[in-house]
C-alpha cells in the first residue's frame, strides 16, 4: 500500500509539523507533499529530505521565506500534486492540504488542525490585523478570501474521513463543513 502525507508547509517546527513527523514515523515509506519546505527544518524534525516533494511555490521568488504572500495561489498549487500512484492520502491540514485532488479509488483521511481561520471565524480579525479592512486593497483581499472560502468548502468534500485534533476543532469542522470528525488528540 502506497501512502502520501500532505502538509501545507514545513518551514518551522510547530505543532502540525510534529504531527506530520508522527504520521511519517508510523508510515516510514510514505512520501511527503508540501507547498514549501526548509531542508534544515525537515532535518530538525527527523524527516528524510529525499521523501519531501514541494510545489512550484518553492521555486518562486521568496517562495520559502515569504510563502504567505502566495496565499491566493495556495489552492491552485496544492491541486497540482499528482497523487495518482498512492492508495492512501493522509493530509495534515489547517489551510489547503486537504484540498489535494484524489481519485474515487483512493482513501483520503484528513487530520484537521482547524478549518482555515482567516477565511472563516477569524476573517474580520485577519483583515484588521493585516491592515486590509478598509481602502482599495481591502476589496481585492476580501475578494481573494471569499474565493478561498468557497474553494475550502468545496474541497472539504474531497476528504473521506476527518479526524480533528480536539473536540473544539471537531465542532468547528461540523459547523464549517457539515462533516463529522473523530477526535484523536495529537501525541506530540
Where in this protein do the model-derived segments appear?
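Glycosyltransferases and closely related glycan-assembly transferases
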Residues: 77-88, 96-109, 113, 161, ...
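Carbohydrate-associated surface elements
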Residues: 168, 187
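Active-site donor-binding segments of glycosyltransferases and PAPS-dependent sulfotransferases
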Residues: 26-98
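Nucleotide-activated donor-dependent transferases that construct or modify glycoconjugates
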Residues: 1-13, 35-36
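Short amphipathic alpha-helix
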Residues: 16-26
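Active-site proximal beta-strand in glycosyltransferases
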Residues: 88-91, 102-133, 182
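Membrane-proximal helix-turn-helix segments that form the acceptor-binding/catalytic region
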Residues: 131-162, 170
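Short beta-strand scaffold positions
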Residues: 91, 163-164
Amino acid at each position: 500500500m502506497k501512502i502520501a502525507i500532505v502538509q501545507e508547509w514545513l518551514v518551522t517546527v510547530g505543532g502540525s509539523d510534529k504531527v506530520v513527523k508522527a504520521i511519517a514515523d508510523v508510515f516510514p515509506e510514505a512520501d511527503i507533499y508540501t507547498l514549501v519546505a526548509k531542508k534544515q527544518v525537515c532535518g530538525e524534525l527527523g524527516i528524510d529530505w529525499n521523501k519531501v516533494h514541494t510545489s512550484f511555490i518553492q521555486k518562486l521568488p521568496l517562495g520559502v521565506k515569504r510563502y504567505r504572500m502566495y496565499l491566493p495561489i495556495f489552492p491552485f498549487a496544492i491541486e497540482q500534486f499528482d497523487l495518482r500512484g498512492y492508495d492512501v492520502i493522509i493530509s495534515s491540514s489547517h489551510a489547503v492540504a486537504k484540498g489535494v485532488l484524489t481519485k474515487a479509488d483512493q482513501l483520503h483521511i484528513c487530520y484537521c488542525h482547524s478549518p482555515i481561520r482567516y477565511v472563516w471565524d477569524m476573517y474580520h480579525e485577519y483583515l484588521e490585523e493585516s491592515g486590509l479592512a478598509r481602502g482599495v486593497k481591502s476589496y481585492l483581499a476580501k475578494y481573494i478570501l471569499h474565493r478561498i472560502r468557497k474553494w475550502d468548502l468545496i474541497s472539504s468534500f474531497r476528504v473521506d474521513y476527518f479526524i480533528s485534533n480536539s473536540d473544539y476543532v471537531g465542532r468547528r469542522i461540523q459547523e464549517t463543513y457539515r462533516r463529522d470528525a473523530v477526535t484523536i488528540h495529537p501525541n506530540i
